[in-house]
Amino acid sequence: MATSRFQAFLNSPIGPKTTHFWGPIANWGFVAAGLVDMQKPPEMISGNMSSAMCVYSALFMRFAWMVQPRNYLLLACHASNETVQLYQLSRWARAQGYLSSKKEEEKPSQ
C-alpha cells in the first residue's frame, strides 16, 4: 500500500521527476539567503535587489496559483520569500531614513 502511494507520487504531474517539484525546492535558497541576511547590518542591504526580489516573488506567486495543476510548493516558497524581502526592504528604508517619523525630524537638537 505505501509502495503504491510512493510510486503514484513519483509518477504524478507534480512529483520529483518534474520541474514542478524541483523548481520550488531550488527557490527555497532565496528564502534561506534572506533569512541569513537578517543578521547583517542594514547598510549591507541592496534596496534595488530587495525590490527586484519582491517583484519577482509577487509575479511567481501569481504564476504558481494560475498554472495547472496548482503548484502550492512554489506558492509557499515565493510567499515566504516575499515576506523576507519586504522585511529586508523595510530594514534598508529605515537605515536610509525613508521610514523616520515626522516627530523625530522635528526634534530640536540639543
Swiss-Prot record:
- Give the chief site where it resides: mitochondrion
Question: What does the UniProt entry say about where the protein is found?
Answer: Mitochondrion inner membrane
Name the keywords, alphabetized: Membrane, Mitochondrion, Mitochondrion inner membrane, Transmembrane, Transmembrane helix, Transport
List all disulphide bridges recorded for this chain.
none
The residues forming a coiled coil are: none
**Membrane topology of the entry:** Multi-pass membrane protein
Annotated Gene Ontology cellular component terms: mitochondrial inner membrane; mitochondrion; plant-type vacuole; plasma membrane; plastid
What transmembrane ranges does the database entry give? 20-36, 44-61
Pfam families registered for this protein in UniProt: MPC
Per the record, the GO terms for biological process are: mitochondrial pyruvate transmembrane transport; regulation of stomatal movement
Q: Which InterPro entries match?
A: MPC
Can you tell me which family this protein belongs to? Answer: Belongs to the mitochondrial pyruvate carrier (MPC) (TC 2.A.105) family.
Question: What is the documented function of this protein?
Answer: Mediates the uptake of pyruvate into mitochondria.
Q: Which PANTHER family match?
A: UPF0041 BRAIN PROTEIN 44-RELATED
**Record-given protein name:** Mitochondrial pyruvate carrier 1
What species was this sequence derived from? Answer: Arabidopsis thaliana (Mouse-ear cress)
Name of the gene encoding the protein in the UniProt record: MPC1
